[in-house]
A protein has these predicted regions:
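A non-catalytic alpha/beta surface segment that caps or lines the substrate-entry region
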Residues: 38-102
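Active-site-adjacent substrate-binding region
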Residues: 55, 76-78, 82, 208-315
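Structural recognition of the beta-strand scaffold that forms the well-ordered cores
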Residues: 96, 107-110, 159-162, 200-206, ...
């Protein structure tokens, strides 16, 4: 989960294409919180998933297979960082899933899929086992369920990006947001050459499974003039759907993956996050702290919002 840190990364680029089949034929009726909860539990059954670990590799394979089966075009964006404890290289890999890749103008939906190496805020076991059910699996679970609907989305194309190394940290001063920073730099470089997709906006899903869900507007997302309309449009959809857990007032100012996306990539990105979570960075961040109802409310809002996005103007 997010915190304020300086960003440093030693990178070696490797891009791995993992192609997907044709899109699924029939679109389901509505977002299922129960299915999303099943996905969350399946991800957590992999165990702790810190960057560079065998469990992270297994999770990545599981997710690639899931999104391929749903009709997404799946690819990996790989690079390396140096382990600040040993100096040895660590494999980092963002997972990218594209829907309707022929559409140049696109919307970015993102989440991080790594878990913190240790539950360092746990008062009893700060070097214990950290599952990251809410902080690591909840945003992923929402995207896994949203995948069922992407073939039928009109308007701009949609990319899912699962960021690695959001919190590959062991001590104060270690850098955060390495995956999103790398992604933003690669995107910015492509835009300078007028290559690749053009992102209209982005939405970051982080810690959205809390059974006591309260999603306030994140202060940075509201304060940035280019991002405020994204925030307002999502909360308007939530109000129409009667999802009261989306509270239309700002509360926390949070450093998260949306910061490099906006500052480096120039992608106006809104952070959807419930930061009032007592189990944050503790051994208690388990599926029992999450609920299908919460995942369902977030997923239905994002799906309805996506369906309302206008088509790109013809050129």
């Amino acid at each position: 989960m997010p915190n304020a840190r300086s960003l440093f990364v030693f990178v070696v680029l490797t891009t791995i294409a993992i192609t997907g089949p044709a899109a699924a034929a029939a679109e389901p009726a509505d977002f299922s919180g129960e299915r999303a909860m099943e996905h969350l539990e399946a991800v957590c059954q992999v165990g702790p998933r810190p960057s560079g670990s065998e469990a992270m590799r297994r999770q990545r394979a599981l997710l690639a297979e899931h999104f391929r089966a749903a009709g997404g075009a799946v690819s990996g964006q790989a690079f390396r960082i140096r382990d600040r404890r040993t100096g040895s290289p660590v494999h980092i890999e963002n997972l990218l899933i594209s829907w309707h890749p022929d559409r140049r103008e696109r919307i970015l939906l993102a989440a991080h899929y790594d878990t913190r190496p240790y539950p360092d805020r746990d008062p009893f076991d700060p070097r214990g086992r950290f599952i990251g059910a809410n902080d690591g699996a909840s945003g992923v679970a929402v995207l896994m369920e949203l995948a069922r609907f992407m073939a039928g989305i009109e308007g701009p194309g949609v990319d899912f990006v699962l960021f690695d190394a959001e919190e590959y940290v062991f001590a104060a001063g270690d850098p955060y947001f390495l995956g999103s920073t790398y992604f933003a730099r690669q995107y910015a470089a492509a835009r300078r050459k007028e290559e690749g997709p053009v992102y209209r906006c982005g939405v970051l899903l982080d810690m959205v499974g809390d059974r006591d869900l309260e999603i306030w507007q994140e202060r940075r997302s509201v304060s940035w003039p280019e991002t405020r309309p994204v925030v307002e449009s999502i909360w308007e959809v939530a109000a129409r759907l009667g999802v009261r857990e989306f509270i239309p007032r700002p509360r926390h100012e949070i450093d998260d993956d949306h910061v490099p996306l906006r500052n480096i990539g120039k992608i106006p990105t809104c952070d959807i996050i419930d930061f009032d979570y007592p189990a944050w960075h503790t051994t208690r961040d388990t599926p029992e702290q999450c609920s299908a109802e919460s995942l369902g409310k977030v997923g239905r809002v994002i799906l309805a919002w996506l369906r309302e996005q206008p088509e790109a103007p013809s050129r």
